[in-house]
Structures are given as C-alpha cells and as structure tokens.
Design a protein with these regions (language model features):
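Short alpha-helical donor nucleotide-sugar binding micro-motif in glycosyltransferases
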Residues: 122-123, 130-135
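Short hydrophobic beta-strand element within catalytic cores of glycosyltransferases
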Residues: 160-163
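Nucleotide-activated donor-binding/catalytic signature segment of Leloir-type glycosyltransferases, i.e.
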Residues: 104-123
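Aromatic "clamp/platform" in nucleotide-sugar-dependent glycosyltransferases that forms part
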Residues: 143
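Conserved acidic donor-binding segment of nucleotide-sugar-dependent glycosyltransferases
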Residues: 178-186, 194-200
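Membrane-proximal helix-turn-helix segments that form the acceptor-binding/catalytic region
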Residues: 1-13
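Carbohydrate-associated surface elements
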Residues: 20, 39
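A conserved mid-protein helix/loop that constitutes part of the nucleotide-sugar donor-binding site
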Residues: 61, 65, 70-84, 105
Length: 232
C-alpha cells in the first residue's frame, strides 16, 4: 500500500497491465494510468521429443497447467475436477513453488490416487516450449490474476484454453476459449469432460488462437507503445 501511494504521488506516469488495475487506481486514488498489456509473438512449434522421453507425453494426450504453484491459481479446482473426468488424457501440472513447498505438497497429496496426474516441477527452455506446443488443452483456473502472460503464451502456441471467468482472463480470450465459472469445480469438470469428448470443437479453438492473440497482444506493438510513453 505504501508503494502504491508513493507511485501515485511521485511517478510521472504509471503503467498497468490490466484494465482492472487501471480502474482500481482511478477509483481509489483518482489517478489516471496507462494500460499497456503484456505481449507475445508467434513462437516456433516443437514436436513432443523431450517431454516424451521424460514424462511419456505425446501430442494432444494431456491437459496442461503451467504457472506458479500458489493457491490463487486455482490448481486445487483443476485437480479435483479432473479426477472425476472420464478420459485417458493426463493432467500435467508444470511449475515450481513460490516461497515454500507446502502448497505443492498439498497438491501432490490431492493427486496421489490418480496416476494420470503428472507434476513436472519448474520448466524452461525446450521443455516449456514442447509442453505448450503439444497440449490438448491449456487451463488457467485462477481466482486472481494480473495480466496472465502464461495465457497469452499458451494461445500463441495455438492452444485451446479453458479459463475461469475472472475479468483478467475473460477479457484476454473473449470468445476464443472455453470459460467456466470461477471456483466452481462442477462447472470446470463439466467443461473439461465436454472438451475431452469433442475434439472437433477443441480444434476450432486451436485454429483461431494464435492469429487472434498475436494480433491483439503483439509484443512489437507493446514495445512501441512503451517507447512512445517515454518519449513524451
């Protein structure tokens, strides 16, 4: 809170990553800000080679979560919902702990009776690229987000995404992803089951995702908007 007040009082300009945060500064402090979101460019799609060797993962045979293992990401909803989905697909939880391993251990305890659920730990480089490139669905079931870069990245790889209906996710995907009610395990499970049974619908979202997100949140445009602000 002290940092916010200092920024409001002293900063020449304030850049925010989401329209929700922009509204917050306006309502709480009466301060105008500049909304400049995260950006992405189209990546190189990689075949499932390293992830196959390390985890036995093949293209379109797994649902992916990739991010920090913290409560606000909604991973417990995803695990609970997935455990009741009738599918041979795996659930891959990729990412490391934030401060301690306590929450990660809770997640592993939740998942221990379902051998379809795989924890990869922190990933980067080729592993990360392959996980994004070959997922059947990418899910971000968060209760709270700023500007979810992982969602932009997932769509840039051409993923069908399943996200919670919080503004920070819904405003990014618009009608180009599957949306479920925040914190609602039943709705999440239902949407997962439907997606696992309807490959044609999933493919439709995949076909639209990359072009849409790379145009809407192009990183070159983001850089130019930031430079324009500094030139003033």
């Amino acid at each position: 809170m002290l940092g916010e007040k200092c920024a409001v009082k002293c900063a020449d300009e304030i850049i925010v990553l989401s329209e929700g945060v922009q509204s917050y500064f306006r309502e709480v402090y009466g301060r105008d800000t500049k909304f400049i979101p995260n950006g992405v460019n189209r990546p190189v799609i990689r075949k499932a080679e390293l992830i196959d060797k390390k985890f036995g993962l093949k293209k379109d045979e797994y649902i992916l979560f990739l991010g920090r293992l913290v409560p606000e990401k909604g991973i417990t909803y995803l695990i609970e919902g997935f455990k009741n989905v009738k599918t041979d697909k795996k659930l891959v939880i990729a990412g490391g702990s934030s401060d301690t391993d306590e929450f990660a251990n809770q997640l592993k305890e939740m998942a221990k009776d379902d051998d379809r659920i795989i924890f990869t730990g922190f990933v980067q480089g080729q592993l990360l690229d392959e996980l994004y490139s070959n997922a059947y669905i990418y899910s971000l079931p968060s209760d709270l987000e700023g500007m979810p870069l992982s969602l932009l990245e997932a769509m840039s790889y051409g993923n069908c995404c399943l996200v919670s209906d919080i503004d920070e996710c819904a405003s990014v995907v618009e009608d180009k992803a599957i949306i479920f009610k925040k914190s609602n395990v039943g709705d999440l499970q239902s949407k997962l089951q439907e997606a696992c049974e309807d490959a044609r619908r999933v493919q439709k979202y995949k076909d639209e995702a990359a072009d849409y997100i790379c145009e809407k949140y192009n990183s070159d445009d983001v850089v130019e908007r930031t430079l324009e602000l500094y030139r003033r």
